[in-house]
Amino acid sequence: MDSSTSLLPPLGSIILACEGLTSLVPLILSVLVCLVATVTISPTLLAYFNDPFELRAYPGPFLAKFTSAWISWIISQNRWSETVDLMHRQHGPIVRLSPDHVSVASPAAFAAVYGHSSGALKAPFYNAFANFKTRSIFNTRDRAEHSRKRRVEAHMFSPRSIRALEDTARVHFQVLVRQWDALCAPTGKTGRGSAEGTLGTISWKVHGDRVWFDCMPWFNFWSFDTISDLAFGRPFGMLEAAKGSAHVSKSNTKSVQAVSQDTSHSDEAQSELLEIPAMEVLSELLDFTVALAYLPAWVQPVFGRLPMFRDGYDAAPKLANLSLTAVANRVASQTDRADMLSELLRGRDEEGKPYGLEELSTEAELLIIAGGDTTANTSCATAYYIARDLQIQAKLQAELDVALDGVESDVAPYDAVKDLPYLDAVINEGLRLHSTIGAGLPRVVPSGGMTVLGQHLKEGTVVSSPIYTLHRNEAVWGKNACEFYPERWLEASADAKKEMMQSFAPFSMGPRACLGRSLALQQLHILLATIFHRYSLVLENNAPAQLPLRDGFARKPMKCIVGVQRRK
């Protein structure tokens, strides 16, 4: 026998050894499962019995006492706001949502948690929203950093700055009107004479004297094009194409080089483009992020790679690239055009420092998220309520007919509609019943604790107060709190109106309130006035009693089929 061969173990010995190991596999797996369970469950049970935040006395779902997985599961099922509201109806104004988190529901509680004197900071929940290393004004948890950003960005959303952008925004209202006019032509679409068809990605059909289509995508096309033009100097082109896609650079590196004003790469970055379904990407990313945000930080990367979260996980770099490409295109244009990015480029903090590449990119991404989705959601929901009640629609149209009599433009001028009592009431009611974010956004109780509704919450406790429940409080809004009733804003006494305003927070309140409030209100006034002055909208006979929603981070309408007709 060869000497080298004699050094090898006999084949039979190897087989026996392998068989021995194979027989141990079930035991090894059992040990591993026990170890994982011990590592996962032991701290949970220990925290429950130690009760470090003294929350055991507060009612809530059984699983919520032990784990944040309960609230994450509810969010992943698109039932966040409504489920928390149900918990409050069952258990009262204070409900436990996780081992360290309570939800408090009342006007006084909302002010205590989010008001200027609160002292509470944003919770670790917001860490999940960081798509860049540098935080945005939305997801930063540092008070000093937020104050610095607010000083730089507040001017961008001042009433004067917003009014200066009205002419730019008007273009996209005009495109929306042109597209809807084409759909409303006698044949349903210009010259075809067909009873049904498609315009871009939107299916339509003619039935009776109306054209029927889903209006939700149109509101998204409009809002994405408007914010991209106002922020970056050019629209994504969704309205013209009737398609929810945008073009991004194939290379993040080239986008970064362009944003860094390395002009040798600017043309190259713009020429190599990839089309992505931007609207879908944004929805997937928000659903993915908020579903994981309440889980422990070490769990999030693991869960993020599960098949059920794959689309959301893949959406993050796509949205980052969308913001990088938008900034790169704007920088490469070298225009002196006044827009939001020019305000960010000129902005300086108290030390005279401008925003760097990372900060520009993360704030650009926030503009796309906030401007591309939130106003569209509220617009669609409000249109749904108006189309559902033809008496409300007729009353609104009568007011608009007087206010816009003699106006030649197809688009309602803001000055002509900004102070119309019934339109204001309709918009307020839409924001009340369908504030884009209905859930309570979490804060951390500061040093020294916090007293809410007579209960002392210890330092480090996570606390939130849900807008959805605040806006449906029957003690304030009456027995018809869940109904769309604009007249409540006109019929209330001075004292009742004051109480209503204290319970009305569609843009939140305090130092972290939405900076884009003025822009959102301007856009809502122009959009709803333009649509309902020009068109009549109705719902299908078999329309759902409630607008179907994805109730995650944003309360996003899934579909809203309307029959549209040009008014005579």
Swiss-Prot record:
Topology versus the membrane: Single-pass membrane protein
Q: Which InterPro entries match?
A: Cyt_P450, Cyt_P450_CS, Cyt_P450_E_grp-I, Cyt_P450_sf, Cytochrome_P450_monoxygenase
Q: Which cellular component, as a GO term, is one annotated location?
A: membrane
- Sugar-bearing residues? N321, N377
Q: Which residues cross the membrane?
A: 21-41
Q: Does the keyword ATP-binding apply?
A: no
Q: Could you tell me the EC number(s) of this protein? A: 1.-.-.-
Its annotated compartments are: Membrane
Pathway, per Swiss-Prot/TrEMBL? Secondary metabolite biosynthesis
The top EC class is oxidoreductase
> What GO MF terms are annotated?
heme binding; iron ion binding; monooxygenase activity; oxidoreductase activity, acting on paired donors, with incorporation or reduction of molecular oxygen
Positions contributing to heme binding: C514
Query: Needs which cofactor?
Result: heme
Principal subcellular localisation of the protein: membrane
Q: What keywords appear on the UniProt entry?
A: Glycoprotein, Heme, Iron, Membrane, Metal-binding, Monooxygenase, Oxidoreductase, Transmembrane, Transmembrane helix
* Function (record text): Cytochrome P450 monooxygenase that is able to use trans-stilbene as a substrate for oxidation.
Family as reported in the entry's similarity comment = Belongs to the cytochrome P450 family.
> PANTHER family attached here?
BENZOATE-PARA-HYDROXYLASE, CYTOCHROME P450
What protein name is recorded for this chain? Cytochrome P450 monooxygenase 89
**Lineage, highest ranks first:** Eukaryota, Fungi, Dikarya, Basidiomycota, Agaricomycotina
